[in-house]
């Protein structure tokens, strides 16, 4: 059975690409036609790629691979967190901080600091500090939770990065490729399929398109790990 149907993709608007003047010629094999100055993605190709991506991700999960979901644009942010948590993955959905992968030692120290501050907040230790000092600590806690909260349970570098919007997440792509971490990428018509191992050509701007793709990938991870793609009430922790 197909991972996703043409009707589901049409309803989600997954076929709408960018204006023709903004295209990347390397995406031509995934483009069906142009209408009113906008490229239309070939959803038959997308369905094939989704099937391949599902099998690839399921196999990776079955072998114990760890996943990091990345998507910081407004329309993807909530979905990225939701689906990453549902399958026990980690996520970045606010801003990619330089060195999140390539300077992992420093990043892990910041994550440890976040955990320390959360323990202090839970125990009431921050509330017991002088007012000014407590305010400084709470601001630091809020900032770390915003940018690193999705990485809190990522104990080491991920084995796979699942990406929404390759063009926006350039730094994430560069860091993953530098470390030879494979990328599963949603690719709009302005993207470069050569910069990922597992391409999924589709509209990466529409919320429903992003939701459709990420939910299927989360299903694949759950199926690989647990033998079922049912929702798991995970906390984002990975070994």
From Swiss-Prot:
One of its GO terms (molecular function) is structural constituent of ribosome. This is Small ribosomal subunit protein uS2. One of its GO terms (biological process) is translation. It comes from Synechococcus sp. (strain WH7803). Gene3D superfamilies: Glucose-6-phosphate isomerase like protein, domain 1, Helix hairpin bin. The keyword Ribonucleoprotein applies. Keywords: Ribonucleoprotein, Ribosomal protein. CDD domains: RPS2. One of its GO terms (cellular component) is cytosolic small ribosomal subunit. The keyword Transcription does not apply. The gene is rpsB. Belongs to the universal ribosomal protein uS2 family.
């Amino acid at each position: 059975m197909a991972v996703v149907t043409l009707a589901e993709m049409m309803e989600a608007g997954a076929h709408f690409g960018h204006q023709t003047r903004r295209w990347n010629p390397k995406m031509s094999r995934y483009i069906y036609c142009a209408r009113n100055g906008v490229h239309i993605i070939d959803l038959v190709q997308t369905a094939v790629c989704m099937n391949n991506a599902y099998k690839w991700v399921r196999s990776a999960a079955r072998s114990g691979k760890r996943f990091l979901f990345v998507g910081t644009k407004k329309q993807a942010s909530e979905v990225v967190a939701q689906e990453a948590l549902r399958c026990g993955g980690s996520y970045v959905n606010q801003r990619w901080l330089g060195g999140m992968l390539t300077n992992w030692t420093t990043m892990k120290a910041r994550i440890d600091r976040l955990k320390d501050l959360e323990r202090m907040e839970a125990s009431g230790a921050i509330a017991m500090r002088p007012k000014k000092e407590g305010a400084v600590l709470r601001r630091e806690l809020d900032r770390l939770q915003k940018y690193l909260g999705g990485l809190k349970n990522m104990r080491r570098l991920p084995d796979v990065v699942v990406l929404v919007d390759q063009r926006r997440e350039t730094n994430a792509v560069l860091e993953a490729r530098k470390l030879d971490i494979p990328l599963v990428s949603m690719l709009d018509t302005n993207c470069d399929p050569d910069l990922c191992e597992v391409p999924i050509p589709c509209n990466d701007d529409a919320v429903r398109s992003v939701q459709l793709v990420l939910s299927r990938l989360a299903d694949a991870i759950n199926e690989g790990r647990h033998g079922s793609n049912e929702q798991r009430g995970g906390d984002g922790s990975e070994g």
